[in-house]
Amino acid sequence: MKRNLLFIILLLLLPGLHQVFATSTIKKVAPTFWWAGMKNPELQILLYGDRISSADVSLSADNITLQEVVKQENPNYLVLYLDLSKAAPQNFDIILKQGKKQTKIPYELKQRRPNASAVEGFDSSDVLYLIMPDRFANGNPSNDIIPGMLEGNVDRNEPFARHGGDLKGIENHLDYIADLGVTSIWLNPIQENDMKEGSYHGYAITDYYQVDRRFGSNEEFRKLTQEANAKGLKVVMDMIFNHCGSDNYLFKDMPSKDWFNFEGNYVQTSFKTATQMDPYASDYEKKIAIDGWFTLTMPDFNQRNRHVATYLIQSSIWWIEYAGINGIRQDTHPYADFDMMARWCKAVNEEYPKFNIVGETWLGNNVLISYWQKDSRLAYPKNSNLPTVMDFPLMEEMNKAFDEETTEWNGGLFRLYEYLSQDIVYSHPMSLLTFLDNHDTSRFYRSEADTKNLDRYKQALTFLLTTRGIPQIYYGTEILMAADKANGDGLLRCDFPGGWPNDTKNCFDAANRTPQQNEAFSFMQKLLQWRKGNEVIAKGQLKHFAPNKGVYVYERKYGDKSVVVFLNGNDREQTIDLVPYQEILPASSAFDLLTEKKVELRNELTLPSREIYLLSF
């Protein structure tokens, strides 16, 4: 009888005993690992698991100090701050103790790569090639659909669906990209976007430390970066600190309400970011512009929360250290908190002094954009610490200039002259990202019918690749891909022909391109290969002249070498007097890099309709 009674008591106690000896379920550890020897010795580790906030936390580690344990409103989170100033590479345990229950979380502090802090960023010697990974090439069809992910279909006939492009597809065409002559690739976001729809573009991140499995793995991305670098190509990674995807665990089960603006409640942004530098702006409009959300499915981070700020900053440093990327393009830069973003840029620069960051600064004019660049006189005494900003106004001017007739006072190439004459507003004009189009705008050619006019293409490319700044080319421009934003963003991001195994046309191969496509490709390739390693273009001073008879003339000069460009901005032949240009014409003849012929420069110069001379001295 006593034995039976004891047995019954044990059965009743089993659930409790299970709770005493079981370990907590840890769902996320971010970052997943770190490195010893970083310049900033502080490490934030975010732990996410079932009701872990009541745990006593300790470390089983050598020379690592647990500085702070911060509970959040949500009992499923703990935020740890560690001091690694004396730590060597090691494996250690984070120990959570709740009563008699103990959980050990293994953690690795890795050895840094040799010269990791010396990673070389992109600059005005580079040309970036922008790729939307889902739309470039499908190198691994087996990862098109991943069981359990929310968007479980691939449909190349639907502009807003996933099409199956991936990292392997990009890797397979690195030789094509390098042969074109660009020196860097910028990838639209590759981090996990486990959203129900529209996940192809990547701008609704659900895990900041994980490559989307439909693109590949973290290791595959690191391999892509290494192979690209080996072929002379830098890699720029797209990041988003302003917002995440609504299926991100940080939003679905918020650590605290103040991790997101408006306590996680949807309030639409006004998109009026000019309020941030407007001396007359109301507090209300400033707040709505910056704290408001892009969409219901893109909750807006509160970067004023120190834990959020550190989480985001560390995530970017983790990718630089892990994958060896050469640059970051920060999406919607002015929509995030100014002070936090300035802190981020400074933190990255302190760890990687040669690194570069470009912020998406989509504002209506150069005055507004200049505010966001490092050392801006307009922002003083504040400083964004952002080295490079995107020159959207120049894009707008270029998309008009090469369609119009040029006079001495307006229209056509006068737009470019007048716009560049205002570069005084920029603290670092050579560090502006310049482009004809990108994944958010109409392509430079809006329809296939427009592509018959290659004069427009050739003049625009010549200007883009010889003026000040860091040029960016959107994938497919070299084969005259065309699209109009009026028809929807999905069509701006069409598949590259030949990127999929069953494509009927493969434009990676010259034999399958039309004569016009090959002419366009060859022209771009010639300019890009000439520009590569050209110090005159990378470092040279710019001097220009107001258009005369519709002809725009400018010089790039570095040391005793120079390049002089003549662009005829009219549909008729023009003859110009060369006397006004003698200060930039050191010889009576010069070699034209495009025709590979000598051009006489004695008294006058005649330029046929829409002609280009690219002269080297």
Swiss-Prot record:
Gene3D superfamilies: Glycosidases, Golgi alpha-mannosidase II, Immunoglobulins. Disulfide bonds: none annotated. The record marks 440 as: Transition state stabilizer. Its EC number is 3.2.1.135. Pathway: Glycan degradation; starch degradation. Disruption phenotype: Reduction by 30% of the rate of growth on starch. Residues 1-22 form the signal peptide. Its cofactor is Ca(2+). GO terms for biological process: starch catabolic process. Ca(2+) binds at residues 138, 143-144, 164, 166. It is an enzyme of class 3 (hydrolase). It catalyses: Hydrolysis of pullulan to panose (6-alpha-D-glucosylmaltose). The active site is at 331, 360. Keywords: Carbohydrate metabolism, Glycosidase, Hydrolase, Metal-binding, Periplasm, Polysaccharide degradation, Signal. It comes from the Bacteria. InterPro entries: Cyc-maltodext_N (IPR015171), Cyclo-malto-dextrinase_C (IPR019492), Glyco_hydro_13_cat_dom (IPR006047), Glyco_hydro_b (IPR013780), Glycoside_hydrolase_SF (IPR017853), Ig-like_fold (IPR013783), Ig_E-set (IPR014756). The keyword Membrane does not apply. GO terms for molecular function: metal ion binding; neopullulanase activity. It is found in: Periplasm. Belongs to the glycosyl hydrolase 13 family. This is Neopullulanase SusA. It comes from Bacteroides thetaiotaomicron (strain ATCC 29148 / DSM 2079 / JCM 5827 / CCUG 10774 / NCTC 10582 / VPI-5482 / E50).
